[in-house]
Amino acid sequence: AKFPGITAPALGRYVSMTQRLKSVLLAGGGGGARLARGFYGLLNEAETLVLTNPGDDFEHLGLLICPDTDSVLYAVSDAIDAKRGWGRQSESWSVLAEVERLGGPGWLQLGDRDIAMHLLRREGLDAGRSLAQVTADLAKRLGIHSLQVVPASEQPIRTVLTTTEGDLDFQSYFVGRQCQPEVLSINFRGAADATPAPDLIEF
């Protein structure tokens, strides 16, 4: 990893120090995923927890989509599409093409490999496992064995924008409508009742 403006000796001292400390990285969006990837391998993985943003999570086609959490998982496991900065590398699009052919929504670019992740997440949640447990399992399936990747809360937190076209979740506004409707207000539904992830408290 490269850290502009930080000399090698200074970085070495920092890494040496962090090897003896517990570290929590707050990761949201593509920048958070790149941060997690940059520090992966430098910090003591067993003593590092990456806390991901659940505010962009939403339901789509019956699946729970966790964009920020998945971006971290893909980035750390080197499975992310580096050119786009999101999604899986070597992706295919057969399912999306068929959904569109059958008249379903095609605005969200979900590739076949990405959909496989969402299906496994849904299976785990439907079996009664927590979001943190399901995320940990997905991390292991991607080859991440010691670094903890944990959604910030088990309770749903949804970013909802009230616009001139009505209420839209963040992805519908940002991706589906390309930020076109005028935003009147922003609400974080569920935030007031959400509690920190148990794994964070125990960490």
How should these model regions be labeled?
Residues 2-17:
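Short, Lys/Arg-enriched N-terminal segments with co-localized hydrophobic residues
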Residues 18-23:
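Extreme N-terminal starter segment of soluble prokaryotic enzymes
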Residues 25, 50-51:
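Structural beta-sheet core signal
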Residues 28:
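Glycine-rich Rossmann-fold phosphate-binding loop(s) that bind the pyrophosphate
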Residues 31-36:
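Short glycine/serine/threonine-rich phosphate/pyrophosphate-binding segments
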Residues 43-49:
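A generic structural motif
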Residues 53-194:
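Electropositive, gly/pro-rich neighborhoods at or near active sites that engage anionic ligands
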Residues 195-203:
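A short, well-structured juxtamembrane/interface segment
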